[in-house]
Amino acid sequence: MRFISADYLYTLHSKPIKNGVLQINNFGEIINIFKNKTEIPSQNIEFFNGLLCPGFINAHCHLELSHLHNTSNSVNGFSEFLEIVKTRDNYSKAFIIRAIKSAEDQMIKNGIVAVGDICNTIDTLELKINKKLHYYNFIESFEVKTEKSKEAIAKALLIRDVFRNNNLKATITPHSAYSVTPDLMRLIANVSDESDYTFSIHNQETEEENILFKDKKGQFRDWLQSINASPKIWNNRSSSFSVLNELRCKRVIFVHNTYTNLLDLKDEYYCTCPCANLFIENKLPNYSIFSSDNLCVGTDSLASNSQLSIIKELALIEQNSDYSLEELLKIGCKNGAKALGFSKYGTFEVGKTPGVNLITGFELSLTDSKVQKIV
């Protein structure tokens, strides 16, 4: 049993507690929360200078792309970034697995306890079986030709079932509105079952996506036409959010939202990956339109980020928004847990096992702050 205290305890369930104390058992479960350290004999308390918050939730990652780290120092837009991703198979399996392991170790060190991870392969399977982190595996499906929709869903089902057969959470999800035909979207909806809590979809990452659906023209349309894509992709959709009706789903996490505006917003969760946004498009979302109650944060992959650190992502959001410190921590912890359906994470509450992070050096901003995993 441990009694852990700090200058401030950010429960993210109630107001911050000055000199609050967490009572935690050997399994990391919160047994009690004390509002004042005087309630506990001082010799039993581990006191830290700084603030304590729950473990971070990385709501969007591509762990299987970790081997593409430092492939390029910069790219000029989304199309150039896709060229990097296309090289993913030019590496040995051993090299890929080592990079995946190193990336997970980095996330653990940086206080991340759970991840929404995009999967196109089973490269991460062996690592995830060890359950050092809690993963929601989104089996990504995409196909722009109607006649290949059944082939695409069959491949996704094979991968999903491998994860599920190893007791790992897995849901087939569309990559994006522009890369999935209406036929494939219908098939994805049809294979969804009661264990699928949410979908995760790349959304409005570039302005060209908006032009495609609104004006039925632009670089995306030209590219799609050049590869003989089904015109139903843009003709049948008035916006990226048209997929909500096609999926007939309960929940969606829309990822990136770099070119999302206030009128676009639906009652869903939105995940921002600011470091990756700057790397790929050199642009950030307009954070003023997003409520701090349904915005979560991800690192994206090491192909588009120098590190997997939620505190660094939050610092960048802080520099470009008016969110308070408590709101930023909710974005980094509570909201991601809610978006992914991870009920044991995200807040300090009795009965939960959320992990405990110590944050120091945050007096003026998160830019110079550091995180240390305590539990």
Where are these regions (language model features)?
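Alpha-helical scaffold segments that flank or form the walls of functional sites
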Residues: Q23, L51-L52, H69-K132, A154-N165
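Active-site beta-loop-alpha junctions enriched in small/polar residues
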Residues: H62, N120, E140-V144, H175-A177, ...
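Active-site glycine- and acidic-residue-rich loops that bind
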Residues: G116, T173-A189, L278-E281
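His/Asp/Glu-enriched, well-ordered alpha-helical/loop segment
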Residues: D222, E246, P274, P285-G361
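Active-site gating loops and adjacent loop-to-helix segments of metal-dependent hydrolytic enzymes
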Residues: S66-R98, Y136-F142, T206-R251
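Histidine-rich, glycine-flanked metal-binding segment
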Residues: R2-F3, Y8-C53, I172
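Hydrophobic faces of well-ordered beta-strands that scaffold small-molecule active sites
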Residues: G55-A59, V115-G116, Y135-I139, A170-P174, ...
